[in-house]
């Protein structure tokens, strides 16, 4: 009996950790996430058993059992073995629920979630909050830190309130586009050219623009606002 217990404990200790790797996402950074996912999935140590979960641009969650090579160019979505899935919110039954076409479902136990999503829905605390609700550990920032750091407008306010220096900037709300002359004056009254504008909550360089004069600044403001209701100028 003691030998059986010892072997059982050894088996549990040697069991691979199963990590759900989320990639893709319904954001402007979808393509960048695919390349990140390929890099992560190809580099995980053998002690880790990954479950690849892709999220389409439309927001559909799919369990993907195919080759990681197909993730890079987006062809993974056409794999016939893909099936719908969702993270179980049940803390007593932690895992990924695979939904088969005929309505049947199975649950795959997971130990943690690794979101390699970029931008909206991925780095803004929403996925992290879902995992918190499900009682699953998340690799990376917790939901509060993710939400704060993803919004540069709010992050700068928090840092400034903590007496941490931030680069001089001006933020605008989309409603200020109704008076473009005033919006430009608000920025140029504080900043000198060249001026950069960007959405406050997009990752990478999505919506980022450089302006050398007021005419270019007007176009930059419009371009940045096409991605988010708040922009920041520096």
Q: Language-model segments: which ranges?
A:
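ATP-binding N-terminal substructure of ATP-dependent carboxylate-amine bond-forming enzymes
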Residues: 8-144, 148-150, 154, 161, ...
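Structured loop/turn residues at beta-strand edges in well-structured enzyme cores
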Residues: 108, 164, 191
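Basic phosphate/pyrophosphate-binding loop/patch that engages nucleotide-derived ligands
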Residues: 158-166, 223
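ATP-grasp fold ATP-binding core
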Residues: 159-160, 187-208, 229-234
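Phosphate/pyrophosphate-binding betaalpha-module
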Residues: 165-173, 198
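Phosphate-binding site of ATP-dependent enzymes
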Residues: 209-234
